[in-house]
Amino acid sequence: MADTQAAAAETNGAAHDLGNGRKHILINAFDMSTVGHLSPGQWKNPKDKSATKRKLKYWTDLAQLLERGGINALFLADTYGGYDTYENSLDECIRRAAQWPITDPTIPISAMAAVTKNLTFAITASTSFEPPFLLAKRFSTLDHLTDGRIGWNIVTSWKKSAFKAIGLDNPIEHDERYRQADEYLRAVYKLWEGSWADDALNPDPENDSYIDPDKVRTINHQGKYFTLHTKHIVDPSPQRTPFLFQAGTSSAGSSFASTHAEAIFVSSHSPQVLAPKIANIRRLAAEQGRDPRSIKIFATFTPIVGRTDDEARAKHAELRSYASVIGGLVLFSGWTGIDISRIPLDQEITAADSLEAHKVRSILDSFTTTTTDIPRWTPRIVAEAAAIGGLGPVSVGSPQTVADELERWVREADLDGFNIGYVTTPGSFEDLVELLIPELRKRGVYPELPAEDAEPVTAREKVYGKGQSGLRADHVGSTYKYDVYKEDPPYVSEETVAVEEAPAEVK
């Protein structure tokens, strides 16, 4: 979004101060199994090959590139329906290839894992559309096949088109979605953490016994939204619970994140807008007995890097010539619930313009919060910003210029890392690996590549350190571990409680 061109600073190879005891910036590559992702229109660019995402080779080539650069993870966004707020129609979403069409991000993961050793994978999956048992089985399988290199980006779905696709007329109300998601997480913790003892799988050929059934607990979950009476069908994987990402900084989203997330994905045009939201999440986590620094915060960031500032500016100008302004407005309208086609070009946009309260409140807030950099949001300004980089900042410059900007965001917003978006693929991620990462390493703020003979680690160990494959002891999921497991009491509705507590003559 915001186009920043910070002045380059001298670098002498000494480690830079990132604040709050941080030593390294964590970087994920941010992609989506679709043609456009955050920069619609680049399919017209002859250098862009994003249409080849339908071929497995795209994904294996990308994974090997990211592995070569020592990137922490490939973070894959997903969506379950098209964007139909703009002009109250899906037509422009389809016409402009604004995250349409889109394939399932889960399918290529095992192929990418087979050609890498250290890269981890974070997949977006919703708590709104499938039973906890099915999701738990899929992620346990992926955790096995990747040797523990899997993460789950938890989302609560909000698009009307997605709910209609599964036979529901309207999305679940915003805060209700998070209450449902909280129960969903507790249900999958029970399956992942509480169903199998560590030594349940103990092959004993002499007695024709592969698994001890007495050490596989039946989960009997009776909640408001979900009911499970089952043993988990997959044996414990290297992490048991995948590394947990979550996106959203609304009041309900922040409360959910401070309880469940190990990493949070945020987005804004300004670090000053993010800083109080991040501080609030860390405060809420501390109130629950969690180490607030254990929650890692990643912001969207799209760098356009050249060997010099002038080269980067020339790249940016070329990329803008292919950008789809309408495609960007389609995404903006879908994310915020504001049909921007109804608003005059230079009229200020406010939250009151959103006609759909179920949309992503944190995104709506980001796009309607002003700063000194962007004192007012109008359709004209949105049109300039949204077509390249989508939600987050766009930094244009040499490796030194962009590295300065990354460091500034880390310090001013209290970030731990970034989800780095692309504009063209190939192109953007090659520049990340070949130009930007070496500069960050030169500054001492990005880890060196592991030794060839180093033992691979899990997704969670890459963040928390070797030996921490499972959930931390201060995470709520640890209360469901096999050895300490206690089944939650069945859900009882408020109406039932009121009737049971009413005097006999009232009953």
Each language-model region and where it sits:
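N-terminal glycine-rich cofactor-binding segment that shapes the pocket for flavin-like pterin cofactors
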Residues: 2-507
